């Protein structure tokens, strides 16, 4: 298994041939198959003797890959898709071939140095001080959880007798905040948004002050959302930051999708207040054109995160010095250098190219909204703020939305699953792929 034989060399050529073809070609949309269906075709792929590299690659390329929806298809506008740059995808091959460990500076100094430069760019465009720092983790769920654990540790120092800890967030906050609260065994204070559907400081202040005055529960973190998954709305971060500072509460910004807009001049004003965050996350695998999976987690004062997350054991003592070890800043020890493909693409293309590509998603959303507003069967939920457009089909039941979505995928036109807003079924386009065109949008709208 560990010798580079002629068979391995042939397999390497086949892998590269497939990878290059996948990068050069228009991506297929494809779609899922049932487990029973896949098993009927493939049987058990794990055998005592093994299938051999050539045959196993064939199993993947001819069957398994086709049973996965391509997130980079230009008409995959579901959830928050992904559109990695060609450079980032190619460099992911290099990372995989290099056996790099990204948990410590001692073992991965060069790779960690590069990751930190990509993090530094995010810190700079957010407006945090140069002393801020961060780490790439698996995704937004792990990033939010890691930051909130640090926030609670800080609150414990000043309020050791608190009965129950509480996270204050919007009723529209991402599901990962609820997940973090469950894992941490803390409560959620879900606060209604204002008439613009934004969480603001006034609403949060009222809710927190009432909670603190009437219970022995205490809010240890306020979570603002910078680009909600459903509608792409940016909370009033500036007023949230003031409310948090006045009450000595940690301010965390979940920007997994939307904080990529920091590099787009046309919407930069929406993020006023993020510079006052104690921590934030943004996922390069969403709108910054990196492959899965990479979430950038940033702390204003990273030494606080190091206090919380550094693991101690006799076999780890050699790592405990002043060098920057990523394992000290989140809930992980073993980690791949998942930020490297993002760093490579960012370094190679330059930040101007990123600004242009993000602006393209914003333009697509605005132009699509105009088409939807003019469509006799459709109605906008609201004007797009970032790159998500939400709308309804007049007269449809929830079942009809789902039937349309299923048929669209079956016909390989696109992947647009329905969502919900205010209890009603909606459709939404999430534009993160610069290859999506208005012709693609029109093709989908023609089916409505």
Per-region residue spans from a language model:
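A short linear hydrophobic-aromatic micro-motif
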Residues: 132, 219, 376-380, 413-418
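Conserved PLP-binding catalytic core of the aspartate aminotransferase-like
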Residues: 379-408
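Short loop-beta-helix segment that forms the pyridoxal 5′-phosphate
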Residues: 122-146, 191-192
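Conserved PLP cofactor-binding pocket of PLP-dependent enzymes
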Residues: 383, 388, 411-428
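Conserved PLP-enzyme active-site core in the AAT-like
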Residues: 142-306
């Amino acid at each position: 298994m560990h010798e580079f034989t002629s068979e391995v060399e042939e397999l390497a050529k086949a892998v590269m041939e497939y990878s290059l073809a996948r990068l050069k070609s228009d991506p297929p949309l494809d779609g899922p198959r049932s487990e029973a269906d896949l098993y009927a075709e493939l049987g058990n792929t794990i055998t005592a003797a093994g299938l051999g590299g050539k045959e196993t690659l064939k199993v993947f390329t001819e069957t398994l890959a086709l049973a996965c929806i391509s997130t980079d298809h230009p008409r995959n506008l579901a959830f928050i898709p992904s559109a990695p740059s060609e450079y980032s995808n190619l460099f992911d091959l290099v990372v995989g071939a290099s056996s790099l460990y990204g948990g410590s500076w001692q073992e991965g100094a060069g790779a960690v140095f590069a990751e930190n430069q990509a993090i530094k760019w995010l810190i700079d465009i957010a407006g945090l001080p140069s002393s801020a720092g961060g780490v790439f983790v698996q995704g937004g769920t792990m990033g939010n959880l890691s930051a909130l654990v640090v926030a609670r540790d800080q609150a414990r120092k000043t309020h050791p007798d608190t009965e129950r800890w509480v996270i204050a967030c919007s009723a529209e906050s991402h599901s990962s905040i609820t997940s973090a609260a469950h894992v941490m065994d803390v409560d959620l204070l879900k606060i209604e948004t204002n008439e613009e559907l934004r969480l603001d400081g006034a609403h949060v202040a009222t809710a927190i002050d009432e909670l603190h005055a009437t219970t022995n529960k205490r809010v240890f973190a306020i979570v603002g959302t910078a680009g909600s998954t459903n509608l792409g709305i940016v909370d009033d971060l500036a007023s949230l930051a003031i409310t948090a500072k006045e009450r000595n509460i940690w301010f965390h910004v979940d920007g997994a999708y939307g904080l990529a807009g920091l590099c787009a001049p046309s919407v930069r004003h929406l993020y006023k207040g993020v510079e006052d965050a104690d921590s934030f996350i943004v996922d390069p695998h969403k709108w910054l054109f990196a492959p899965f999976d990479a979430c950038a987690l940033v702390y204003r004062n990273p030494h606080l995160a190091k206090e919380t997350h550094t693991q101690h054991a006799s076999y780890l003592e050699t790592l405990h010095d002043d060098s920057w070890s990523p394992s000290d800043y989140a809930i992980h020890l073993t980690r791949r250098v998942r930020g490297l493909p993002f760093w490579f693409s960012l370094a190679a293309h330059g930040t101007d190219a990123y600004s242009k590509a993000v602006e393209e998603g914003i333009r697509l959303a605005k132009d699509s909204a105009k088409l939807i507003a003019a469509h006799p069967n459709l109605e906008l939920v609201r004007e797009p703020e970032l790159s998500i457009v939400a709308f309804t089909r007049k007269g449809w039941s929830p079942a009809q939305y789902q039937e349309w979505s299923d048929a669209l995928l079956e016909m390989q036109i696109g992947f647009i699953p329905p969502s919900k807003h205010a209890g009603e079924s909606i459709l939404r386009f999430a534009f993160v792929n610069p290859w999506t065109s208005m012709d693609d949008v029109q093709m989908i709208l023609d089916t409505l």
